[in-house]
């Protein structure tokens, strides 16, 4: 049997209210796709039964895997372990893909694969779908990447602060994910940052299509990016940030200037996000955690990496001046209104 072109992994936890919409959009890819539905120990609704229903109805496309609750990261790990597709993409069960864009992307991947030029990383746009005001906002990369051709890290432009690669925008070759040795932490939110970040040094070729493929649903009260939820779960954000500090030696990338620069940019963003949500907490314990995070960065990176982050974008949220915290939170509120990221 021919290898599947792509594996979609859909971690599901009590997702019965919305997962069908997600799955139906993935089924539009037909037999060239493998869909792995990972039931993460759901007990409150019909998620396990829905996974089994689709696996029975589409036995050549859908696999249902039931696991003890391990969190979103273990759902992604489970997908990687079981994937047979050339490419691997995670789709959260409350999100979906645009079907027309998906067909276009897969047609291009088929063409590139037939030519023997399949890239390590395929990149597309993603769209924030805001439920609270029925608006949308597209994140695209036309200023960063060449379009509709193969390229490498030497060809990329400058990322704006609101323009990082996220899980929503990437399709990795499955082998790249295995080669980098990535294993996401269990019972931890925000591990999608590790998923995007850790494999980057293993990516040698890329392809960008200016298509709005991924639809990122935002606005559920219990969503992990909801501000109040993030404040409560800030320890998990800190755990992920420390993991990212440790998982790659950025000094080993000095010969790849643009790749190193982007990874510094991403790590700076993670430090800034951690700082902001600790500031929103506002407690003495949170201030101690903030100081400990910066001390961890200093102890686990070179002086050059630390200085780049501390005195660059990441350090903007850790101002050692009077009323620095108020200035940071004021800037955060302005950015929140402009970009509506949570």
What do these predicted ranges mean?
Residues 1-25:
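N-proximal low-complexity "stem/linker" segments adjacent to membrane-targeting elements
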Residues 67-83:
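Glycine-rich, basic loop-to-helix element that forms the pyrophosphate-binding segment
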Residues 72, 95-206, 214, 218-230:
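Donor-binding/catalytic cores of nucleotide-activated saccharide
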């Amino acid at each position: 049997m021919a290898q599947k072109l792509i594996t979609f992994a859909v971690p599901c936890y009590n997702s019965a209210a919305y997962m069908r919409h997600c799955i139906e959009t993935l089924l539009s890819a037909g037999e060239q796709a493998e869909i792995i539905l990972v039931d993460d120990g759901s007990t409150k609704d019909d998620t396990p039964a829905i996974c089994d229903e689709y696996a029975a109805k589409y036995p050549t496309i859908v696999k249902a895997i039931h696991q003890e609750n391990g969190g979103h990261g273990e759902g992604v790990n489970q997908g990687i372990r079981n994937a047979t597709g050339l490419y691997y993409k995670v789709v959260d069960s409350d999100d979906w893909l645009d079907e027309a864009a998906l067909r276009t992307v897969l047609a291009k991947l088929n063409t590139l694969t037939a030519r023997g030029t399949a890239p390590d990383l395929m990149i597309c746009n993603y769209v924030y779908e805001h439920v609270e005001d029925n608006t949308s906002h597209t994140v695209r990369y036309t200023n960063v990447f060449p379009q509709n051709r193969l390229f490498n890290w030497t060809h990329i432009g400058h990322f704006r602060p609101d323009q990082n690669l996220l899980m929503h925008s990437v399709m990795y070759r499955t082998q790249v994910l295995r080669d980098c040795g990535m294993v996401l932490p269990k019972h931890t939110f925000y591990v999608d940052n590790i998923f995007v970040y850790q494999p980057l040094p293993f990516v040698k070729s890329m392809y960008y299509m200016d298509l709005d493929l991924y639809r990122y649903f935002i606005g559920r009260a219990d969503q992990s990016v909801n501000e109040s939820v993030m404040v409560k779960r800030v320890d998990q954000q800190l755990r992920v940030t420390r993991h990212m500090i440790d998982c790659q030696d950025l000094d080993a990338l000095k010969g790849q200037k643009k790749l190193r620069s982007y990874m510094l940019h991403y790590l700076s963003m993670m430090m800034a996000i951690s700082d902001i949500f600790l500031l929103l907490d506002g407690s003495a314990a949170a201030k101690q955690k903030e100081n400990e995070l910066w001390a961890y960065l200093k102890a686990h990176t070179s002086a050059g990496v630390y200085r780049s982050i501390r005195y660059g974008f990441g350090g903007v949220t850790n101002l050692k001046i009077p009323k620095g915290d108020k200035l940071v939170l004021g800037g955060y509120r302005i950015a929140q209104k402009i970009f509506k990221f949570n």
